[in-house]
Amino acid sequence: MAQRKTNGSKLFMMVLYMVAACSAIPISDLLDRASQRSDTLHSLSTTLTQDLDSHFPPMGRVITPRPSMCHTSSLHTPIDKEQALQVSEADLLSLVRSLLQAWRDPLVILSTSANTLPHPAQNSISTKVQELLEHTKSLGDGLDILSGKFGPAAQSISSLPYRGGNDISQDRISRLTNFHFLMSCFRRDSHKIDSFLKVLRCRAAKLQPEMC
């Protein structure tokens, strides 16, 4: 299964590199493939959050930081589809790329921490986080290439540094709580990434707004 996913990521990148050399494939088709990958990201992050919820200490719910504490919260993004439709395609792609870039380091930390997470489903969680890491990198690299077709605005990336350090804590409750919080933040952002890419796909296909 892992080998198949890795091969899929390599194929996704190979197609985009080919398109960078020759514009043989319509942008709408490339965005369709990107939105399929973002859908996988969001589904996987949702499953991971549910796995963590199944064994989350009551105290953890009390001390979990608010969503506004997520390191990407400072990025101003559309709150719904109607707002997203008002944003230019280049700016929307820039938002997606900024969110993906912001999660490269935190996902590495989550992947490392998952290896020793005090949770009954630790092995499954560790495998899924590694898949998230690979999918996120593949999608980000692909959109980096695709951004060249949308102009300078799409190539701009907002800096959203993660300042949580390289360790999510030592004691059991804090470790589970911090891991859960980071995963919840990623799930929220993966929903934005998926939604924005679907809007971009819709607009590239020149569908009516009500069809998006």
Swiss-Prot record:
The keyword Signal applies. It is found in: Secreted. Residues 1-24 form the signal peptide. Belongs to the somatotropin/prolactin family. It holds the Pfam family Hormone_1. GO terms for cellular component: extracellular space. Pituitary gland. GO terms for molecular function: hormone activity. GO terms for biological process: positive regulation of cell population proliferation; positive regulation of receptor signaling pathway via JAK-STAT; response to nutrient levels. Its main location: secreted. Keywords: Disulfide bond, Hormone, Secreted, Signal. PROSITE patterns: SOMATOTROPIN_1, SOMATOTROPIN_2. Disulfide bonds join 70-185, 202-212. InterPro entries: 4_helix_cytokine-like_core (IPR009079), Somatotropin/Prolactin (IPR001400), Somatotropin_CS (IPR018116). This is Prolactin.
